[in-house]
């Protein structure tokens, strides 16, 4: 999964950053999906695609305007492709990933001036005591790609410790 998470609000996001976010988070997955679908159809085979999206596709924090919009576009593309390709038995689903402990997140935290121990401070504040790790998501991705999920397409699964719309 590729992704770009650079920060910017509605007022201060330069057009160049907006374009870069959409190039990485929406255009690149579109081009990859296009080639996969063409290849599967040419071979006459069914298949499955899983897009790694983000919880921010639901709206996101104010400092993630371009990121949230680009991942929202990927969420829409995921649903559109799922509908368009179901007759060819090509399934397309997405994972809306919550706050995760990844090298990219560490780089963003450092760039934003977070102290070196930011993770040890942030983890205990999470409902389950840590950030999501890639190994947590791997099982879901494997399931979505497997025959066990052969009747599932167009799903956007929220993989997070928080529940959208639940307060208190």
Regions found by a protein language model. Give the residues of each.
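Residue(s) in the substrate-gating loop at a strand-loop-helix junction
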Residues: 54
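Short C-terminal tail/terminal secondary-structure segment
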Residues: 59, 142, 153-168
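Active-site helix of classical SDR
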Residues: 33, 70
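Alpha-helical segment proximal to the catalytic Tyr-Lys
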Residues: 38, 83-84, 150
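Short, small/polar-rich loop/turn modules that mediate ligand/substrate recognition or access, typified
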Residues: 86, 91, 152-154
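Active-site loop immediately N-terminal to the catalytic Tyr-X3-Lys motif
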Residues: 11, 59-65, 87, 129, ...
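Substrate-binding pocket helix/loop in short-chain dehydrogenase/reductase
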Residues: 9-10, 17-19, 122
């Amino acid at each position: 999964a590729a992704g770009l998470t650079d920060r910017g609000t509605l007022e201060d996001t330069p057009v160049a950053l907006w374009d870069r976010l959409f190039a990485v988070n929406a255009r690149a997955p579109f081009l990859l999906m296009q080639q996969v679908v063409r290849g599967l159809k040419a071979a006459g085979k069914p298949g499955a695609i899983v897009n790694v999206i983000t919880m921010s596709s639901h709206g996101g924090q104010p400092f993630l305007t371009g990121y949230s919009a680009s991942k929202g576009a990927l969420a829409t593309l995921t649903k559109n492709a799922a509908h368009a390709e179901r007759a060819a038995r090509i399934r397309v689903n997405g994972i809306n990933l919550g706050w995760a402990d990844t090298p990219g997140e560490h780089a963003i935290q450092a760039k934003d001036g977070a102290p070196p121990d930011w993770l040890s401070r942030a983890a205990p504040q999470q409902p389950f005591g840590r950030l999501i790790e890639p190994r947590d998501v791997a099982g879901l991705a494997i399931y979505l790609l497997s025959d066990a999920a052969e009747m599932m397409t167009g799903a956007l699964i929220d993989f997070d410790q928080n529940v959208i719309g639940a307060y208190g």
